[in-house]
Amino acid sequence: MRKVAIPVAILALIGLDQWVKHWVVANISLNQVIKAIPGVFSLTYLQNRGAAFSILQNQKYFFVILTVLVIGAALFYLVKNYQKSLWLVLSLILIISGGIGNFIDRVHLGYVVDMVQLDFIDFAIFNVADSYLTVGVLLLILILWKEENGSHH
């Protein structure tokens, strides 16, 4: 992936996350549930003052510091390894974008806007940035596991 494409991808992903969050805040009342696809997923506007699954509620400064450290480490690793694997770059782009997307909410609003509720499973309500983080971390784990086991592709 060319150097210029990386920041463009990060900004585009952050933009999508922030646009969805702004749309939800403008169009859905707090705690309102809208069945988007019945039985599959709903949109539910929540203000999450903790981490994933609403743990560590009201620990804003802890999350700000943790996010800065994680984004800093991911950026450093990306700069050092951007020429290695497209999959590695993609995983880091997702982690950085998701971290920054939720960081913007936490600093600007004091909470993170969550909205995606999976109706077919008992699971926490999450947002687009959380999806980026989850996919990015899982992809990174898979890449590192494959490297550790000598399966280079």
From Swiss-Prot:
EC number: 3.4.23.36
Gene Ontology molecular function: any one: aspartic-type endopeptidase activity
InterPro entries cross-referenced by the UniProt entry: Peptidase_A8
Annotated metabolic or biological route of this protein: Protein modification; lipoprotein biosynthesis (signal peptide cleavage)
UniProt topology in membrane: Multi-pass membrane protein
Spans traversing the lipid bilayer: 61-81, 85-105, 125-145
UniProt GO BP: proteolysis
UniProt entry keywords in alphabetical sequence: Aspartyl protease, Cell membrane, Hydrolase, Membrane, Protease, Transmembrane, Transmembrane helix
Catalytic reaction(s) noted: Release of signal peptides from bacterial membrane prolipoproteins. Hydrolyzes -Xaa-Yaa-Zaa-|-(S,diacylglyceryl)Cys-, in which Xaa is hydrophobic (preferably Leu), and Yaa (Ala or Ser) and Zaa (Gly or Ala) have small, neutral side chains
Record-level GO cellular component terms: plasma membrane
Location of the protein in the cell: Cell membrane
PANTHER family, A to Z: LIPOPROTEIN SIGNAL PEPTIDASE
Summary of the function given for this chain in its UniProt record: This protein specifically catalyzes the removal of signal peptides from prolipoproteins.
Family statement: Belongs to the peptidase A8 family.
Name of the featured protein: Lipoprotein signal peptidase
Organism: Streptococcus thermophilus (strain ATCC BAA-250 / LMG 18311)
